[in-house]
């Protein structure tokens, strides 16, 4: 329990029993014969309160305690979602008994993941927290253009607009929405959140674009606190708006203009030639759908799952390890059993090997040898080129350095891969969200994303084995998360391989839509979200680096 112990719960007042239910995420309260379901407790309370008063005074007070416990790191996000689930059930029970009246909610926010971004977990968590703290949430979904967001804010007379996005590109889309609001002289305060955002970008750059308030929310409860001020009609709103209009001067980093100065194309001096280039077991493309899900689960990065996806936050590493051992690893194993038995995850891989050479900052990909030939010829047909950025100082690396230069006369090999666990995971997580099964939604979404990453990890190991370079693999799976193996895999959208549009080239070669059912969106993202693609490089010097 997270509140009063069960030994004393039977002696509590009806108000405290309801708060206990919310804080502890339990839909029945009491011991033995005294145990009562939530609906009975609500009926008892209705003898003293109107439904609206019960929500606003007792139930929301319970949710406030939940927020305080979360802020103090005394409650984990999954437990917060348990509480939100109880709150949702209580409100759903009371709503038919309420007179329809305006003003029964604290205020309205229009929420959206911006144009081009398919990620919705962060936005949906904000929806859960705000809607179960008395706010009306108009959740527009993913990939929302600015005009749709603004139109919805006008239609619903929103107190604020909430913009969410995971990608670096999404931060620019947020700026475009804010510029549109300014151009139209509209006055909706805007709350921004997402993994690629920084406080500096919001409070400095974005506030320069808009005169009516822009706020940075690093989690759902930060968004709640901002909304609570914006939805009031007193000094708190004015004070909060003044804050949102005040540009905060941050120290400016030195800016390099990418368009000026020479483009260096000379191979880095720290990258040597590979004396014996590996030969792949086949040229061209293959599809694999025979990975054992149990084996894939062994390659899940638990730190990424527990800390990033499930958002475990503790006061100390000791507390974290105890929580993982006592609560969260058992939950993980139970969920793995469920998805294995149900067939919800369907691991599938399309990958291939192609002859390749470097030409300055380019990697040239050639057609595969025809007939029985295992060796690409010197007059192989060029299919396409990937162009990579180069570091301007230091080691001056580019991914192209890790391939044999065209001038060497040697033909190298490039690996390409795309992995997915299929569409059903997305369908089921959306169903759980809409059904109010918030905690299971968080758990399943996190597991689905990390299972796709685990599939990428285990398949990269398979490719190293096929290329004959796996002898350098660490025997410890956790070491593989830190590149304790020969070579590297680079995914589009990351610093050394930033151009998302290059996904179209990978798609031209691997044909993932027809082979494994993964499509490319208009902004070059993979759908379903639980998919990832990569360029696979065998060179011993190839590791992650920042350009």
Give a label for each model feature.
Residues 121-126, 149-151, 172-174, 200-206, ...:
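Short acidic, glycine/serine/threonine-rich loops at helix termini
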Residues 126-129, 133, 139-208:
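Cofactor-cradling patches in redox/metallo enzymes
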């Amino acid at each position: 329990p997270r509140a009063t112990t069960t030994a004393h719960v039977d002696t509590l007042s009806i108000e405290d029993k309801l708060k206990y239910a919310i804080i502890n995420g339990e839909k029945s309260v009491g011991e033995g014969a005294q145990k009562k379901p939530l609906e009975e407790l609500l009926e008892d309370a209705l003898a003293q309160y109107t439904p609206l008063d019960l929500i606003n005074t007792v139930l929301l007070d319970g949710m406030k305690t939940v927020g305080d416990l979360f802020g103090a790191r005394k409650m984990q996000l999954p437990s917060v979602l348990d509480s939100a689930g109880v709150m949702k059930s209580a409100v759903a029970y009371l709503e038919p008994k309420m007179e329809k009246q305006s003003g029964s909610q604290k205020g309205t926010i229009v929420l959206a993941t911006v144009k081009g971004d398919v990620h919705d977990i962060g936005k949906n968590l904000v929806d859960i927290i705000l809607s179960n703290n008395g706010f009306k949430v108009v959740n527009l979904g993913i990939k929302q253009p600015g005009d749709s967001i603004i139109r919805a804010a006008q239609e619903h007379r929103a107190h604020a607009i909430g913009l969410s996005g995971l990608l670096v590109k999404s931060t620019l889309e947020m700026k475009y929405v804010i510029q549109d609001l300014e151009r139209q002289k509209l006055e909706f305060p805007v709350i921004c959140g997402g993994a690629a955002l920084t406080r500096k970008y919001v409070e400095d750059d974005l506030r320069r674009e808009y005169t009516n308030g822009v706020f940075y929310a690093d989690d759902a409860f930060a968004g709640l606190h901002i909304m609570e001020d914006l939805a009031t009609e007193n000094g708190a709103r004015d004070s909060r708006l003044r804050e949102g209009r005040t540009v905060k001067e941050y120290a400016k980093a030195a800016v390099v203009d990418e368009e000026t100065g020479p483009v260096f194309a000379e191979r880095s001096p720290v990258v040597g030639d590979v004396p014996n280039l590996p030969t792949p077991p086949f040229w061209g493309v293959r599809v694999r759908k025979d990975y054992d899900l149990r084996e894939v689960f062994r390659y899940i990065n638990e730190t990424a799952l527990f800390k990033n996806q499930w958002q475990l936050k503790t006061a100390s590493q000791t507390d974290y390890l105890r929580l993982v051992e006592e609560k969260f690893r058992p939950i993980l194993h139970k969920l793995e059993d469920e998805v294995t038995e149900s067939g919800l995850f369907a691991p599938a891989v399309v990958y291939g090997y192609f002859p390749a050479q470097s030409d300055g900052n380019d990697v040239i990909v050639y057609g595969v040898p025809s007939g029985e030939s295992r060796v690409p010829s010197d007059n192989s047909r060029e299919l396409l080129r990937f162009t990579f950025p180069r570091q301007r100082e230091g080691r001056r690396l580019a991914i192209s350095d890790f391939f044999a230069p065209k001038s060497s006369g040697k033909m190298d090999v490039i690996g390409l891969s795309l992995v997915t666990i299929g569409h059903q995971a997305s369908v089921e997580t959306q169903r759980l969200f809409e059904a109010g099964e918030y905690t299971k939604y968080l758990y399943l979404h996190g597991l689905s994303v990390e299972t796709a990453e685990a599939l990428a990890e285990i398949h990269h190991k398979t490719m190293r084995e096929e290329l004959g370079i796996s002898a350098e693999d660490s025997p410890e799976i956790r070491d593989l998360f830190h590149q304790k193996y020969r070579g590297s895999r680079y995914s589009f959208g990351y610093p050394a391989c930033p151009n998302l549009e290059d996904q179209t080239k990978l798609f031209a070669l691997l044909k993932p839509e027809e082979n494994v059912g993964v499509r490319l969106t208009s902004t070059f993202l993979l759908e379903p979200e639980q998919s990832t693609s990569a360029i696979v490089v065998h060179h011993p010097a190839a590791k992650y680096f920042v350009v």
